[in-house]
Amino acid sequence: MNSKVFVVLLLLALSTCVLSEKYCPTPRNTSCKKMNIRNNCCRDSDCTSNAFCCAEPCGNFCHKASDKPGGRRVDPNASCKTGYVYW
């Protein structure tokens, strides 16, 4: 009986961890003119209020976490500078 209770509690704990995963929201814009690309952040630590630094077509921007996957967090190891990006 104890092993059944343990398994149920373990599954409950694991599902809570999986459901609490946070993501970058889906970007609003799907395209961007090159002259409008700017990075407001290069890593999560550049953002305030526990926001994520998310990659979007017009650059990197801080966003509140979303429960649904759809966006992409910026790779903190990638070469990045804040400000306008000139190609």
From Swiss-Prot:
InterPro entries: Elafin-like_sf
Cell compartments where the protein resides: Secreted
Record-level GO cellular component terms: extracellular region
Disulfide pattern: 24-54, 32-58, 41-53, 42-80, 47-62
Domain WAP: 21-66
Domain of life: Eukaryota
Gene Ontology process terms (BP): defense response to bacterium
UniProt similarity note: Belongs to the venom protein 11 family. 01 (wap-1) subfamily.
Chain's role: Has antibacterial activity.
Protein name as catalogued: U14-lycotoxin-Ls1b
